[in-house]
Amino acid sequence: EIGVRLVGSEMCIRDSLKEAPVLHIASKSWKNRAGASRDGKSCTQPLKVYTNADKVEVFLNGKSLGVYPVSDKVVSVDIPFVNGENVVDAVIEKEGREYRDQYVCNFQCVNVKNGFTEVNVLLGAQRYFEDRTAELCWIPEQAYEKGSWGYIGGEVAPNKTRYGSLPASDKDILGTDQDPIFQTQRVGIEAFKADVPDGVYAVYLYWTELTSENKREALVYNLGNDVVREDYINRVFSVDINGVSVAKQLNIAEEYGSERAVIKKYIVPVSQGKGLVVRFGAVESVPILNAIRIVKEY
């Protein structure tokens, strides 16, 4: 019997007929990818290939990346994705016959200096999220380094359960069908900085207040983790962008309600090579940020 079953976001191949060829590139439904790139030209990310062959040759855009030995019917291959369309081919040979599987995706290499167009960042997250409607990819946060982009200060928001912590909140966020953008956050963030070139940028800030006085039923995909209720926090903070105040006393829960998506857009000119800095100041409790999107207008 040969079968395929879905586990999380990957395909696990179950094979009991060893003589039948099995070959499958994982995550083929992920059509829009992105990642931080030091040169703006390529970004290396792992890609799993499932097969019952002893080895598999992997190609990127027609060029061989090498032949990889297979262990326990799976091999993880580091793919140097390039900007634009990427075609990945996996090839095995069984009894003199060649078998091939193919994966095609669009990739955005995020680099603030070379060809920067946009960056979409999930704060408090170490996961990716594909927005298929908008055809874009949200990438994990990183700490700021000179010449790049990232957060300054704060810590990942805890998502506590009776059995430990979840990597993200399980809350159903009101006002959006893109819950993963709002289910993680950085608490106590001081700033988000991007050393982008001079120009005009649209800056989108994404918030939701994940603490609430209301007990909500766990979502189906919570799988009975018994989330520990976090009490409501009266959170007030200020926001300024490149020295210009855009909010003096922002209270997300008071103004919009808890567990509700809030998106604010600002048009920001960048000049004199100073880059882009969004600063957060505590008024009561500590600031939060769930996600940020920076798009170059011109």
What are these regions (language model features)?
Residues 85-94, 276-281:
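Short, aromatic- and glycine-rich surface loops/edge beta-strands on solvent-exposed regions
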Residues 64-73:
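Short beta-strand segments within Ig-like beta-sandwich modules, predominantly Fibronectin type-III
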Residues 1-8, 12-13:
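Single conserved hydrophobic/aromatic residue that forms the stacking wall/gate
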